């Protein structure tokens, strides 16, 4: 057991990600470390599903609140445990006592085939640990930090914490149910994005929206089921039930050339195209005043995924900042659980969403 990972000069962060994106997450951590003049280095293994960041001087803990594109969760490590025996609670207890109290318990594992084999063990471990923590007051709802116990296997891992006020899902994996009436699985991306960015799938206060490249209508359905009137722009076929039962108007047109007659609250776009072209189009919708906010996907390049993505987001930020009469830009981006080779982006001029 190693409980002295942190001192006044050092810090270790544990970031979970989709397997295969460790290098992108490491590049993102390196970028923010350079930007904040924090000395340190990442430790990443391909397809492991997580990255460790070791700060030699300075801290990147502020990233827990601002978030990272490629990180599903981010916790500050309080200690590492290795080769602990079957009495895991006794082995971990001194560290838990020193780090507590906690608002909730997250038991996490890599999102890999091997990691998922730990789920049964972790369910049993929760039943044993959670009552013990509550009994001695180490687990109470009003605490300002949550506890992360990450197991790389059943005997090794890290103990970490994250601010309770930062909305996080255990393991960063938000498993959503797809209703039978949903036109496509892409509908889950919208729901996850709203929960990830705003803490609730019902956070939108929009009344009107445009869905560019809408067919068969997964994104339109997510908006319309919340009472938003949607213009669904696509030459393709929309789900008939969507048009019959929801406030959705099918507009035959091209996602990149169609223009609205009047301003809408929200434009959404999930098209398969070069990310630079998609971003430029969303930039136009926002800076021309056609929409107040945008939710869209950017397909990831094959190489330098973080660097290329960050450059595009910086370009969008600069363009929106030039329109300062519309307000301060708010841009959020994440590689969601239901994303694959893409990220989901929110951009607006208002903080009321």
Swiss-Prot record:
Coiled coil: none
Record-listed S-adenosyl-L-methionine binding positions: 186, 215-218, 234, 254, 270
Domain of life: Bacteria
Principal location class: cytoplasm
Matching Gene3D superfamilies: 3.30.2300.20, 3.30.70.2810, Vaccinia Virus protein VP39
GO function term, MF aspect, one: methyltransferase activity
EC number(s) reported in the record: 2.1.1.186
Signal peptide: none
One Pfam family, short name: RLMM_N
Similarity section: Belongs to the class I-like SAM-binding methyltransferase superfamily. RNA methyltransferase RlmE family. RlmM subfamily.
Subunit structure: Monomer.
Reported function: Catalyzes the 2'-O-methylation at nucleotide C2498 in 23S rRNA.
UniProt protein name: Ribosomal RNA large subunit methyltransferase M
Organism: Alcanivorax borkumensis (strain ATCC 700651 / DSM 11573 / NCIMB 13689 / SK2)
